[in-house]
Amino acid sequence: MHCSIRLIDEVEQEIWDQYILETSGNPTQLVSYSKLMHGNGFPIFVSIEADGKVIFQWLLTIRGQRNFCFLQAFSEPTNEDSGCIELAIKTIRAQYHPFKFVFYDLAFSRFSNRTLLEQQGFSEIHEYQANVVDLRQSEEDIFKGIHSKHRNSIRRAEREGVQFFEGKDSADVERYYHLSQATYQRTQGKNVEKNVFLEAYQALHDSGNIRFFFAQHDSEIQSAATIVMSPKRAVYWKGATKSKEITGASNFLHWEIMKLLKKEGLDFYDLSGNISSYEQGDKVEGIVRFKHRFGGVISKYYGGECVFCLWKNILFDLYKKIL
């Protein structure tokens, strides 16, 4: 097997993306998504060939400065072959000498082999879960797979006249962010910065890899969702709701999203990941229950951190604390 590393100006987008779509279909492994990997980092495109054919691809990021950088992956490679992953990490370490590897993202990564992470030296491993709805089913079967309470809420929202629409421009991104700010203030959570959404929109909108959807009632936004997608798979990235929204508006929103994506020919709708362990009554419990009631297959996934150079990692942690 031969492993090669390319930078963004060296990779052939059509060929890279075609292989991603033929395998994992993960939208965060497409070349367009790498446009978000900037600032103090840059994307690297790792591919492995055997007998003249590509058998493995992985888009990752190098963060930091020369001689003091770390490796980060937002999502899984195209397969979980232990030999390929070991070769990929070995090749990256030889070229860039990262002091650690951070491979963990609740929203986008779907790596299912905990044993492989342990074999590669990941000492801090996180477990999480996600439910994925198969859109290749009939619309009737998809609706039957939704929990009865969600179905009743969807019907109620329809009777109340809740409407569904897709955002078309940056003004809708602003509209989404305004609602998300209110959501996080209400739940005492921490929202991501507005420029994260604007940059994601600018990088991914033209290629159709990011979309914003809304549910409104009497011209007032009730609920919104941000979807990151490929032609095969859509992932629910972020959501926002109005305080005291019309009953069922959020349920209705995701049902309409699933129907639209099915009509467009997508195969899967991923409701995004959540931690597996939480205390009863925690707000995470309500979020998990809301997602799981849309049906689909619930699976466990893993991520974590592997330290290659302990003293550099200690310095890095101290630096973060100072900031």
Positions of PLM-derived features:
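Active-site/acyl-donor-binding loops of N-acyltransferases
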Residues: H2, K35-L36, P43-F45, I62-Q65, ...
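A conserved beta-strand-loop-helix scaffold within acyl/acetyltransferase catalytic domains
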Residues: C3-D51, I55-R66, F111-H126, S138, ...
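Aromatic (often tryptophan-rich) hydrophobic motifs at membrane interfaces
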Residues: Q57-W58, Q65-F70, E76-N79, G83-P98, ...
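Beta-hairpin (beta-strand-turn-beta-strand) motif
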Residues: F74-T78, L106-S109, D134-R136
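Non-catalytic accessory segments adjacent to catalytic cores
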Residues: G83-Q129
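Residues at or immediately flanking beta-strands
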Residues: F103, G161-Q163, F268
